[in-house]
Amino acid sequence: MTHLFALSAAAADIMNISLRSRLSAARLTYIDSLHGTSRQQSFTASLLLDEAIRLCCPSVPRPLDIAANENGKPYLTAAPDVHFSLSHSAAWAVCAVSDHPVGVDIQQCRSFKPNIADRFFHPDEVQYLSSLSPADRENAFYTLWALKESYVKADGRGLRLLRQFCVDIACQPPAITVGAPGSLFVPDFPDPAYKLGVCVQEEHSEAPALTVLQHLSTP
C-alpha cells in the first residue's frame, strides 16, 4: 500500500528548536549548509518524511537514519524494506511511503519548456505534446514531467532513464507504454499551480490518497 503526504513550507519554521530536534544531527548539518529557499525546502521535506514514517511505520526508530545505495537512492537504514520518496517545489513538499519501490514528484507549473521536452522526453511524448493546442500543451507538459520524474525516482538509476521509457497520459490512469511496468497516478492537488506525479513499481497498484498535513505533531 502507498501513502502520500503533502506539507506547506509555511508549517515548518526552520528556527523552531522543537521541530529541529526531530531530525538527526547529520541531516541538520546538511540542511544548515544550504542557503535561501533550498534550506527551507530541504527542512520542510525532511520534517515531512519524519512525520510520514511516524504515521505509517511507528516502529521505525527516530530520528531517522538515511543512507544511499550505489546509485544514490536513499533508504532507511533501520527499515530498508520501507520505501519512500520525497520531492519539493517552491511552497510545497510531498512524500510517498510504500511497501514497493515508489517515486513522487511535484512541479510548480509555469510555462511550457520545449527545450526540456526535446532533450529529456521520449520521442512519442514529444510528438504527443506537439499535437496539442498551446493551452493544453502546458498542462500536459507538467503532467508528463512529474510522472517521468516519479518513474525515475522509483527506479533509482538516475536521469539517464528519461528518454528510455514512454508515458501515455491520454488514458486514465496514465500508462507506461515503453519501459518497465508499474502504476502511475496524478493525484488531485489542492494548489492548482502544481502538478503531482506518483509511480509505484507494482502493476495494478491501488491509487494513493493524498493527505495534506496542516501541522506537525509534537515530538
Locations of regions flagged by a protein language model:
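Core catalytic alpha/beta fold that binds nucleotide/phospho-ligands
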Residues: 1-219
